[in-house]
């Protein structure tokens, strides 16, 4: 064996040993992000006894810029940029995200190594005044940072006033309790994961409020070239959840959507069949125009399904709504 071949072989062995001995997980510092990273850490540790798994907690621009609407400062990519930099710089091996916070298209350097089994995808009403949105008094102020939620709220409940709210789950609850809002809308799964079930006044059904693409799913991101890391996290992947969120994200990608536009999408496996049904929505910010479309197909055609539903929405005039939103 030549010296060059020997050096390469030793390098590859060292890489395998390094991966086998430890893995570092990049995560945001918010309580919910830490919960998700700890969840992934526990799963990896369970599957790989003896492997050292540690968190690399980071602050992101999205966590720091709390005085402006996300739609006006660059969208939810602000929550992942620092974590991706940690992967590229070698400070972390994987990054854990809420899938709904990730852009539809990743940089060529990265891939989704796993989508964990999805949790509750629905939104929740949190208020100290009523158990339902319809029972809130006219003019009641409802807080949300999501244009998707704003659009659907105003369409179904025009008697309400919707205002921007930023911060992590506990910060938003504090603002509600402090009287700045009469109610707020949050993802049910976030409250459940933080053992805040008691704060949920009512869970909003899929028919009441269609979720964001990927809502409720935890994503594990890694570098495309890290084959050993991809093999390590592959057992965390849930096949059906992966197909469903692929269909949802495909709709959003077809519409060039991100958190700066009111797009909703939710796919689920049809009971007793080998098909997933996909529902999607595009709405104006003031809720005066809501477009809906749906279709179904086998899981392996998830991306094609999403493209078809996206085309249906475009045929209904979604491009006009989205161009109007972009000008605001």
Write out the residue ranges for each language-model feature.
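Short, Lys/Arg-enriched N-terminal segments with co-localized hydrophobic residues
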Residues: 7-18
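A conserved helix-loop-strand patch within extracytoplasmic ligand-binding domains
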Residues: 99-100, 108-160
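Short, Asp-centered acidic motifs that coordinate Mg2+ and/or phosphate
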Residues: 93-94, 183
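Small-molecule-sensing regulatory modules
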Residues: 20-65, 72, 80, 99, ...
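Short, structured active-site "lid" loops
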Residues: 69-91
